[in-house]
Amino acid sequence: MFTPEELRQAKIFACLDEAECARMAQNAADVRLKAGEWLVRSGETPWFYVLFEGRLRIVADIHGIQTEFPEYDFTAGDFLGEVPLLLRTPVFNSARAQTSCRIARLDKQQFFQLIRDSKEARAMVLEVLGERLLRIQERSLSLMTSRVLIFGRNKEADCHNIRAFLSANRIP
């Protein structure tokens, strides 16, 4: 279990008042991983994670090949998980421990409470979110494109919705 003093070591929690920090410490799960263990896998329910010890690396499944991204390593003080929480989607990249790690895990409700109650925490999350969404967009554009073929009636709502999604996301 994390103490409020331990949580304050991370910038995201340092801006909280004593009562808020104590509440976060009481509710945060204390996750410990060994090198090689998975923190989260693609497709799982999102959580908000703050790394206190160790190093995590992002791993993505690209065209059926597991690809590591050393440029997306996380170290003590870094947080992750905000993108799928804010977009209300499942996790789309996996994270694996490169070394032994200690991580604070907050659920969706705790995360939204954190950014609702703390202007400073909200600003930090939004700044990092913008950077990460830009990286995601750049990486997506650099990948080989796939062609999608849809079978169905033109006027069916499901087919229309799928075509609209593909078009909006520039998928040929």
Residue ranges and their predicted role:
Residues P4-I62:
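Regulatory nucleotide-sensing modules
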Residues L7, A28, T45-P46, E68-F69, ...:
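Short coil/loop residues immediately preceding or within conserved phosphate-binding loops
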Residues Q9, Q110-R116, R147-L149:
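Short hinge/gating elements
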Residues E20-R23, Q113, N161:
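Short, solvent-exposed alpha-helical surface patches in well-structured domains
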Residues F69-L126:
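Cyclic-nucleotide recognition modules
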Residues M124, V128-R139:
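Intrinsically disordered or compositionally simple regulatory linkers and C-terminal tails
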Residues L141-P172:
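Local sequence-structure signature of Cys/Sec-based thiol-disulfide redox active-site neighborhoods
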